From Swiss-Prot:
Keyword Phosphoprotein: no
Protein name: Proline--tRNA ligase
Gene Ontology process terms (BP): prolyl-tRNA aminoacylation
Compartments (UniProt record): Cytoplasm
Gene that specifies this protein: proS
This protein's domain notes: Consists of three domains: the N-terminal catalytic domain, the editing domain and the C-terminal anticodon-binding domain.
């Protein structure tokens, strides 16, 4: 096929959009692939839609290859199924809610587990109908508080979500592995650099969970990995290595807890300064202190309750880890009004004693094991307690993974230190188990004639996000550099000479390429060569053929936009040579 730029619906921009923060956002708008229509909302113009459809088809082919069957649910969904699973409430403000003219409640689907489960329950009733793998490629909607980075985080986005249905856990494991391997093939075809990390399931529920993260400095997700063992996880899923607890006899021999007047020491830094000037007989660091952070937490449909979180003083609380640990509950830090309401909370001097005495739930970092001694608040202004021992002087209500994970921390598998990096989530696979089947009573008749509850897997890929991810990983200072598998065209032919013979020759070359099955973009505009070259580099088609001054000598120039090489090739046989270059890309 030949597309003439003189007829193509396209306008490129020379300057970056004022609100664009990341390279993909800037380049996709400048190159005319997408246009913003509102916060987090984008129109797909012809070039952008071609890239999107190519990614979509790669995903579709791989899903079909593992036995997936494509269906399509509406984006507008009734409230009732999401009430059954409590996700009408759990999703909170991220859910787009609306009513029809009869005041019936609806939502714009953020995900479709409920609909898949109900559909399979309604259609199939025997173990003979399984295993089953269904998928859809559908727009999803989430009311992001701060849409950012263009199509990387929008309010409307295209996703592939697939679901496996099996009658036993072995079937679920097979489906999980099949999807995991299919995802690896997909991302390899798309030339995306990625890492697979352990993850938490969040509001989706379920047990085993892994994310596919595209490597990117602009990614919102932080992950860590151990280079010695290959362990990798996002920070929400990292399990803290727990020190060995000591025996009760050893605990009995520890120094007694003592309260000290520490003066004006409401911060960890001021407390450490005091401790090192107080002749405690040892050097004190922030890691020897216990910082107690106060929150208010509300379960879906419940009331606000106080929660104390104790972490070593050298660690900050990580909002993502805290949120993942508390999900589906929402939380907020206490403000001055809250502290005024609870006078036993002495800001800057909070300790476990007052929390436990007043019935406040108190969770601590896993490092706070029995026998560890801490310097922490004594619940009085200007006072702290030294050598407060866990398991002897206080017993928390449990542990919570809320402290930040740092580069250099020991890997949970004990193989070496962790290194940190940033990434963009492009895929997620879950072993959901029976959470949704339980919610809807999705049973079928088993081989023994008794009911069997279905077990499910859920597998998502951000199709529209992948357009931006590929643009992030494959661009330079001149513009985009699309891999051949997703480029809107195979070859961009630039007529860089006003000579009539060169124009005719370029048109004939494009026709020859078309006959060889090459998808050609022909820049037949009357613009200057400089404008045409800039647009060719900006648009990012992997192969650029320049028909210019060399035409009179029987020469055209072939440029590899992806690799950067340039070659002069004879006009005779040029189409075949270009086609061969494409085949080897």
């Amino acid at each position: 096929m030949i597309t003439r730029m003189s007829e193509l619906f396209l306008r490129t921009l020379r300057d970056d959009p004022a609100d664009a923060e990341v390279p993909s956002h800037k380049l996709l708008i400048r190159a005319g692939y997408v246009r913003p229509v509102g916060p987090g909302l984008y129109s797909w113009l012809p070039l952008g839609l071609k890239v999107l459809r190519k990614i979509e088809n790669i995903v579709r082919n791989e899903m079909n290859a593992i036995g997936g069957q494509e269906i399509l649910f509406p984006a507008l969904l009734p409230r009732a199924p999401y009430e059954t699973t409590n996700r009408w409430t759990e999703y909170g403000d991220t859910l787009f809610r609306l009513q029809d003219r009869r005041n019936n409640d609806y939502l714009l689907g953020p995900t479709h587990e409920e609909m898949f489960t109900l559909t399979v329950k309604g259609e199939y009733s025997s173990y003979k109908d399984f295993p089953l793998r269904l998928y859809q490629i559908q727009n999803k909607y989430r009311d992001e508080a701060r849409p950012r980075a263009g199509i990387l985080r929008g309010r409307e986005f295209l996703m592939k979500d697939s679901y496996s249905f099996d009658i036993d856990d072995d079937g679920l494991k097979n489906a999980y592995i099949a999807h995991r391997e299919a995802y690896q093939r997909i991302f390899d075809l798309l030339k995306v650099r990625y890492v697979i990390v352990s993850a938490v399931s969040g509001a989706m529920g379920g047990s085993a969970s892994e994310e596919f993260l595209a490597e990117s400095d602009v990614g919102e997700d932080t992950y860590v990995r151990c280079l010695q063992s290959g362990y990798a996880a996002n920070v929400e899923a990292v399990v803290t290595m727990v020190p060995e607890p000591i025996s009760s006899e050893q605990i009995a021999g520890l120094a007694s807890a003592t309260v000290h007047h520490t003066g004006d020491t409401p911060t960890i830094a001021t407390l450490v300064d005091w401790a090192n000037g107080a002749d405690l007989g040892r050097t004190v660091t922030a890691a020897d202190t216990l910082k107690n952070v106060m929150l208010k937490v509300r379960e879906p449909g419940g009331e606000w309750e106080l929660l104390g979180v104790g972490v070593p003083g050298d660690r900050e609380v990580d909002d993502k880890r805290l949120g993942a640990a508390l999900e589906p509950a929402e939380y907020a830090m206490l403000d001055d009004a809250d502290f005024a309401r609870y006078p036993f909370l002495v800001k800057g001097y909070i300790g476990p004693k007052a929390l436990l005495a007043n019935g406040v739930r108190y969770l601590v970092d896993p490092r706070v094991v029995d026998g560890t001694a801490w310097i922490t608040g004594a619940d009085e202004l200007g006072k702290h307690v030294v050598d407060l021992v866990a398991g002897r002087d206080f017993t928390p209500d449990g542990t919570i993974e809320a402290a930040e994970v740092r580069e250099g921390d020991p890997s949970p598998d004990g193989a070496g230190p962790l290194v940190a990096a940033r990434g963009i989530e492009i895929g997620h696979v879950f072993q959901l188990g029976r959470k949704y089947a339980d919610a809807f009573g999705a049973d079928v008749l088993g081989e023994n004639g008794k009911p069997v509850r279905l077990t499910m897997g859920s597998y998502g890929i951000g199709v529209s996000r992948l357009v931006a991810v590929i643009a992030e990983q494959h661009h330079d200072e001149l513009g985009l550099r699309w891999p051949s598998t997703v480029s809107p065209f195979d070859v961009h032919v630039v007529i860089a000479n006003k000579d009539a013979d060169a124009r005719t020759g370029a048109t004939e070359l494009a026709a020859e390429l078309d006959r060889l099955g090459v998808d050609v973009l022909l820049d037949d505009r009357t613009a200057s060569p400089g404008v045409k070259f800039k647009d060719a580099e900006l648009l990012g088609v992997p192969w650029i053929v320049v028909v210019g001054r060399g035409w009179a000598d029987g020469i055209v120039e072939l440029r590899d936009r992806f690799g950067g090489d340039k070659h002069e090739i004879p006009v005779d046989g040029a189409a075949e040579r270009i086609s061969a270059a494409l085949a080897g890309a």
